[in-house]
Amino acid sequence: TQMESPGATGTLSWILSALSISAKIIANKVRCARLVDVLGEAGADNVQGEAQQKLDVISNQVLLRLLGGREGVAIVASEENEEPVIIRDDPTGERRYCVLFDPLDGSSNLDVCGGVGTIFSILRHDRRAARAHDSLLQPGTQQVAAGYVLYG
């Protein structure tokens, strides 16, 4: 509770709620994928050189849109994007967190009804870093939160 953590502002909970809402939207897209013709390749490769799936692109857009609108998020980094997205300048220091994610891990399993999910990690944004991107290069022990949402 907030009484147990006097420095808590609710910002982390607000970010987790964006991830939760994103997961509900993505789960619905995965569930209805065959019906609305969003299975298969999107026609581009991701940064690892893998063929991007249509649902990879859709899931990435959902997460970027919802996380980008949350106060407290400074940087968002996705497996589907070559560069991290800096949400906004933050002269007041209110944007305290970086969110890293794979929007649809295992998307190549969709054609065979294999399991897919979203992997995420939340780190504190280091405003003292020489480059904003350096905030993303932290050991796992520095994670504030991390998780995997399994869709099926």
Predicted region positions:
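N-terminal subdomain of lithium-sensitive/metallo-dependent phosphomonoesterases centered on the IMPase/IPPase/PAP
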Residues: T1-L104
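DPxDG-like acidic metal-binding loop motif
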Residues: E94-Y151
